[in-house]
């Protein structure tokens, strides 16, 4: 019955889903603050060399696991076994913990614009404390089930896209009309300065171009199959890259790059636009603030519940306690959600110790979020490399090019991501205490805990169960496939003439 519901997503539907999953105006603001209009060509390159190939990698894993509703755990287990599948799924969850720290201050800033009409500036410590109370509230709401979350997020996302297109059209018209941009738009300004700081910011760019894993899972549901999927993904990637590039090119038409804030940058650029066209800025601030606040708060509620539910229900039973993974009547693991809340508290408070302003705090939080977000795709790429190296003969409906092409493409991506990860983990100008105790310390503690937790689980298994848990599923599939082929060969071999 389930099979009859497949192949129901049209090309335009997939294009819309891809756009909604990947594009965010806040990503334009974040990267403009560091790179200026030089982020414009970098965005386009990132979508071509990362987003499109990574989508195809995920699509191949989905094709490999087409008989199951595969997730990150299943994809990596198929090529690397259970241990690395758990580590990868775990990194996706703990990246989300850092994501909360960057999202919560934005919710506060946009609430200020929505209700006051301007950004009320708090100290870093006050911002962190308010963020903690806000996260406690969102955890409580998410555990209770948010019925209106889907419709609210859909409406606000549509409004944000409408605002984005409106800004591009109006800012472009202003430039064509002869306005002198606040910051120059020329070849020199668009040329990145290739240094260690730039390599660190590439993590922000790749994070902005992420979202492939949420789109590529639908490769089996697209009308026209894998060929149609590949065409749409390439078109989507180019479209998103162009939109990011054009937005980045026009973001400083009305507002200087140096004046933009990580928290309320979206409102700032629309305030500049409204001032140029003679529109009431206070009303514009409130409108954009309300739309942004609603979208951010909806995103907060969704991400508070969804990742923790997916992670704790996808991994094998026995790694965490039964009470931790038990679902309430709304389908949310309540205890795990509150554990998530208590972990975020020190992640919010520690960076305030070395931050003189909310802008400094946000720089640290976004940088660490971007650095951590490099790990899950990196593990998936390593799994894919192992798949093409050792198990490429496993039958599947879709492959990203030949074996050599797949290995070459993913090897380049692994090299880029490795450099970007280290450059963002050890950024220039950051406090050595922040780097040691937050950037490095946070990763060591979280990954070390995951490794220890899996070792305890593995020791509790029998030798046979441990063998099957750590065995890549692709290896089992290949052995079964070759066994079937050998049996078929025996059946089809002509019988030899026997001596009388």
Q: For each predicted feature, which ranges?
A:
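Membrane-interface "cap" regions at the ends of multi-pass membrane proteins
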Residues: 1-40, 45, 51-59, 67, ...
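C-terminal membrane-solvent junction of multi-pass transporters and transport-like membrane proteins
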Residues: 4-5, 327-330, 374-425
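Helix-loop-helix junctions that connect adjacent transmembrane segments
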Residues: 7, 41, 121-126, 154-289, ...
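Helix-loop-helix connectors at the membrane interface of multi-pass transporters/channels
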Residues: 77, 104-127, 163, 221-225, ...
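Membrane-helix boundary/coupling elements in multi-pass transport proteins
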Residues: 91-106, 216-218, 279-322, 377-384
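Membrane-interface loop-to-helix entry segments
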Residues: 111, 128-180, 210, 233-238, ...
